[in-house]
Amino acid sequence: MLEVEGAEEKGIKVVKVEGEERLCTRNLVDGVQVYGEQLIKIDGVEYRVWDPFRSKLAAAIIKGLKHLPISVSSKVLYLGASTGTTVSHVSDIAYKGVVYAVESAPRVARELIERVAKHRRNVIPIVEDARRYEHYPAMAGKVDVIYCDIAQQDQTDIAIANAKAYLKDKGYLMLIVKTRSIDVTKEPKSIVEEEVAKLRSNGFSIEKVIYLEPFDKDHAMVIARYKS
């Protein structure tokens, strides 16, 4: 299940819970849950169970993601933060870094702030449409990783525009391709191939494509490196 390089340093672990192997991250804020997840103590260290049916990043790890570009000190721009389920686990991993969490819906952003940002020193919420990236509050320099999980037909174009503005050279884009948001009439695999071609033509090299079934139907994660 767990093949992530540097998993121990990043606080990613597989733990047996009631006889079943479950993916976990070391909790940055002891005793605080984000989405009702189970908290487990191991040798005095608290971990949070990471549900792959609620987090596409967890699904990708279980489906064999080895090179997770997010390090303990990464600066991450997270597009489509929603209420902060995956954001919180990224915050656990990048505990010495920062997560700029972009969410466009004010009501959802309020939940993100209450559930996550209020408790976690390394999460900075940005209430803005990811298309209006030039309106983000000033960020301290460029980011190491952009994680994009937005259900829009032009999701890849939005990710590319944000990368051109904020991603370091040789930085990584982790793009969730939601094929049914792009075109319901085409085969999901052909849509993923089209989005990958779009990334290549904009200066990205593709490291990995992971299809997320059975956790998320018709979704894939693309790991791409910028101007490498």
Model feature map: region roles:
Residues 1-48:
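N-terminal auxiliary segments of SAM/dcSAM-dependent transferases
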Residues 71, 94-95, 166-170:
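Helix-to-beta-strand junctions that scaffold the AdoMet/dcAdoMet cofactor pocket
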Residues 70-82, 100:
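Conserved class I S-adenosyl-L-methionine
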